[in-house]
Amino acid sequence: MGYGTRKLSDEYEVSEILGRGGFSVVRKGTKKSSIEEEKSQSQVAIKTLRRLGASNNPSGLPRKKDIGEKSTIGFPTMRQVSVSDTLLTNEILVMRRIVENVSPHPNVIDLYDVYEDTNGVHLVLELCSGGELFDRIVAQDKYSETEAATVVHQIASGLEAVHRANIVHRDLKPENCLFLDVRKDSPLKIMDFGLSSVEEFTDPVVGLFGSIDYVSPEALSQGKITTKSDMWSLGVILYILLSGYPPFIAQNNRQKQQMIMNGNFSFYEKTWKGISQPAKNLISSLLTVDPSKRPSALELLSDPWVKGEKAKDVQMDPEIVSRLQSFNARRKLRAAAIASVWSSTIFLRTKKLKSLVGSYDLKEEEIENLRMHFKKICADRDNATLSEFEEVLKAMNMLSLIPFASRIFDLFDNNRDGTVDMREILCGFSSLKNSKGEDALRLCFQMYDTDRSGCISKEEVASMLRALPYDCLPTDITEPGKLDEIFDLMDANNDGKVTFDEFKAAMQRDSSLQDVVLSSIRP
């Protein structure tokens, strides 16, 4: 089969969304030839890396890579992948290196196939359905150093394999470690190599995204990034596994950066008195500022504590698990918010939408009706097909907009999967309404308080941040940890949800933040 003849939809049934990143979306897929067979052996994760510009000659792939085969056939070459998105091309390069030098490995995500079309590149990956690392731990009845050592051993095993292939992950954190399945003895897989680099071959992706909690001192100081940078990140993960909080805690982001670069952390007696000395010694070696003095992944695999020989097999203080639960909830909320901000294109969509519908001005009750009709007509409540969107417009008697339905729909179908996010369309229409003051803030807030509970959940906060036009975000938004600071301003009592009073108070404390949020409902 020649280039350009294969289509993802010909071979896979693509279903629900498993997750979103700033530059990608991951969905569950089932191989069509196996739909009636054992689904457990035919289900995959399909990661679509969105391209910023269409290729003049998008290429398909000649055939599927047989599992275990070390051929590079099936990967678009750099000439064939004519895209401007550095992250897209970088991830393809790294995944090709993994296929050639690492796969299959019990602790590294496996890549089965690659497809390319005008919308982007689709990576067909091993499906990890066992949940994130911290989710599994906080749900356990018993948790001890032994369980933590098993986790570290598996991560070190995966890192040793990718490091041997000269790959630096550069974004190692709990959410990038998933269990393969729900079995108690399920292997833990390292995934998401979008920010990775191949030593002496590719340049590391420029910039730091999200929290700096796991970032090494050399990365913060823009020094040389090596495999030892991943070992620092593993040290941070281990510290959290044994205490329930990160090693570097500060009043603001600048102070935290300084603490990291100085390696300024401690083992507080109240928390760490029950933790073994070998565990603390291991953390200290991993969180050494000088990268050359940190142990390698290979050395870690022979460490007595990591092997379980010196890890305490007694249940940890329940307070540690409680803190870990709280930390995990906030981490997930921030991750969702950060991904949403980086995926934002609502500003450009709103300008195009306004050019289509002119001065059509929706009142607040019309926006509410639009939301209600979406939920009533759309099968999955949050996403609409074109025909469902047209039915919504008809039900609302918005007849003047029906001729533009397909064009409006196309603005919001960013990944060209034939569906659009209801909340993004709501926000787009709301942007045509010029509101001010508290009414404007309440409109922003209520638009995403979909269950009318009086507070915004983590998913709803993520949607709200997605609606912020990038052009209006603070100029320092790309600084490490800046997005964490913005969220901290909103969630004043750290309970993982934001009330309107908290939301409004954050706006009043920071006028620049208010300008950012209000920009999402102004033309």
Curated annotation (Swiss-Prot):
Activated by calcium. Autophosphorylation may play an important role in the regulation of the kinase activity. The modification Phosphothreonine is found at residue 271. It catalyses: L-seryl-[protein] + ATP = O-phospho-L-seryl-[protein] + ADP + H(+); L-threonyl-[protein] + ATP = O-phospho-L-threonyl-[protein] + ADP + H(+). Its EC number is 2.7.11.17. It holds the Pfam family EF-hand_5. It is an enzyme of class 2 (transferase). Autophosphorylation. It is found in: Nucleus. Ca(2+) 2 binds at residues 449, 451, 453, 455, 460. Residues 400-435, 436-471, 478-513 form the EF-hand domain. ATP binds at residues 18-26, 47. GO terms for biological process: intracellular signal transduction; nodulation. Induction: Small up-regulation in nodules. Belongs to the protein kinase superfamily. CAMK Ser/Thr protein kinase family. CaMK subfamily. This is Calcium and calcium/calmodulin-dependent serine/threonine-protein kinase DMI-3. It comes from Medicago truncatula. The gene is CCAMK.
